[in-house]
Amino acid sequence: MFTPTTNNAIGGATAATGAFAFGARPATTTAPPPSFGAATSTPTFGAAPATTSLFAAPAATPAFGAPAATPAFGAPASTPGFGATSTAAPAFGTAAATPAFGIPAATSAFGAPAATPAFGAAAATPAFGAPAATPAFGAPAATSAFGAPAATTAFGAPASTQASAFGAPAPAVGTVAPTFSFATPATSAPTTAPPAFGFGTTATTAAAAMPASLSSGIGSFSFPKPQATTAASLNFNTTTTTATAQPFNTGLKLGTTNATTTLGGGGIFSKPAGQAAAPAASTFVGLGGIDVTATQPKLGDNKQDGIKIKETQVPDEIIKTVDGLKAYIKQQKTISSDIGRTSTSKFTNVSHEITNLKWALQNMATLVEGSNQQIRLMRQETVKAIQSLEMAQRTQDTPAGLQFENNAPFQYFQCLVAKYEQDLIAFRQQIALTERHMHAISNPQSISPDDLKRGFRQLNESFISLAGRLHEVHQRVEEHKEHYLNLRRYRLRDTTNVFERIDNPPLPTVEPQRISSGPTPFSNISALMNKSYAAAASSASNATGN
């Protein structure tokens, strides 16, 4: 049998009443805990024989290391077993007059308050799973044992008036301590008791916890919002800061009310000291510096339209450009409508005026051409008159003995006689025409309009036949021309067009003839007269030839 010494606990602090200190000195000798749950009819080594017993019922003689009165599972006994005191010692986790191994005298068992039942059961009703007046291991309860609903906290929850048990967190003021049972959570009160495992330091920090939710029925599997919880620290003379963790939520329902259970972990298995929460994610910014989340619907908006349109804010530069484009398009539409309503009569009038101006220009060109022809004729007549004047002057200046050499007067009179002859012929023709006309007037003939129509038709047909023959001859000439050019191209290897001068005659350059003045004493009159007579003779011959 192990006998504890009188030394103090590690760290020099005496264990407080109701709390467990590592290596604390008990007040008196302790008895070993009873066996798990039930007593046997035959005592074990070092124990007296016992009477008959039932499951979870007290027996006369306990088993090895158990009290004399064998209790039910977690219930006190009346008779101690081998190596135990004569007083009735509680089972594991229950209050007794004599404490168990490592627990001070006149205090509660491991992790439980005084005057409490055994591990997981109550003293009044020792049956398995039946309601009891006190809670299970580590926390006070008013109703149920293991597996039954209770009015207060269950496994691992701290008491409302004492220090926390082994491994149970010490919550702050006004916080709801999560439990590990199937009952509702209990509201704990502030406490300053030292933790169950440590060196007398006060646990003022909390560690992360992961609650597991068990609800009635078969529910969903989710991760609700993180919860800030507190738990006792297992470190040595250190504190930890409050941190949050993602809870673990299940939808398992066992036919009881919803109860949130906390599996508290701290110290060695918790987050490092001084570690803060994760920083918030940066806001996503879209194109143009516009917050994309600003245009998204909020969580509370349940309005659903029939047609969802994706709309985003457009930068001011693009809006200005679009507005300018719209104004330009509107202006162009206005101009187009004005053009569409404009009448084309003005353009028609202008085209008519242009045509009239073209006809007037053609008439003016004809008049100018006639005037030019008259000018040329007058110029020729002026030249002839000058030549005649020079001839007369030279004839007068020539002496009488030399007149046989001067033939200019003879040519002059010859041309003059020829001209008179032509004029007489022309006059005779005019006189004959006049006589016929007068004869026709004096002797009228009956000519009907049909005769005139017939005569004009015959003239028209004759002109058409002549035009057809002329065209036929022209085609033959063109064929001979092409044949000749091909022969020159293939036989003589000459690609030049010999008919180019005929097809495209150069424009004649008309130079104004020099009009000389009368004879002067300083000029060579004989040379001028000879030239003048030669020019006059050539012009006269050309005139007679024409």
Curated annotation (Swiss-Prot):
Ranges occupied by Sequence repeats: 22-23, 36-37, 45-46, 64-65, 73-74, 82-83, 92-93, 101-102, 110-111, 119-120, 128-129, 137-138, 146-147, 155-156, 166-167, 197-198, 199-200
Protein keywords: Glycoprotein, mRNA transport, Nuclear pore complex, Nucleus, Protein transport, Repeat, Translocation, Transport
A Pfam family annotated for this UniProt entry: Nucleoporin_FG2
GO molecular function: nuclear localization sequence binding; structural constituent of nuclear pore
Cell location: Nucleus, Nuclear pore complex
Key word Repeat present: yes
GO cellular component: a single term: nuclear envelope
Domain of life: Eukaryota
BP GO annotations: mRNA transport; nucleocytoplasmic transport; protein transport
Region annotated 17 X 2 AA repeats of F-G, chain positions: 22-200
Keyword Repeat: yes
Annotated signal sequence range: none
PTM (free text): O-glycosylated; contains O-GlcNAc. O-GlcNAcylation increases with increasing ambient temperature.
PANTHER family linked to this entry: NUCLEOPORIN P58/P45 NUCLEOPORIN-LIKE PROTEIN 1 (PTHR13437), NUCLEOPORIN P58_P45 (PTHR13437:SF2)
Oligomer status and interactors: Component of the nuclear pore complex. Interacts with Nup54. Interacts (via C-terminus) with fs(1)Yb; this interaction occurs in a RNA-independent manner. Interacts with sbr/nxf1. Interacts with Nxt1.
Role according to the record: Component of the nuclear pore complex, a complex required for the trafficking across the nuclear membrane. Together with Nup54, required for transposable element silencing regulation in ovarian follicle cells. By interacting with the nuclear (Nxf1/Nxt1) and cytosolic (fs(1)Yb) components of the flamenco (flam) transcripts processing pathway, enables export and subsequent piRNA production.
Free-text domain note: Contains FG repeats. FG repeats are interaction sites for karyopherins (importins, exportins) and form probably an affinity gradient, guiding the transport proteins unidirectionally with their cargo through the NPC. FG repeat regions are highly flexible and lack ordered secondary structure. The overall conservation of FG repeats regarding exact sequence, spacing, and repeat unit length is limited.
Family: Belongs to the NUP58 family.
Record protein name field: Nuclear pore complex protein Nup58
Annotated gene: Nup58
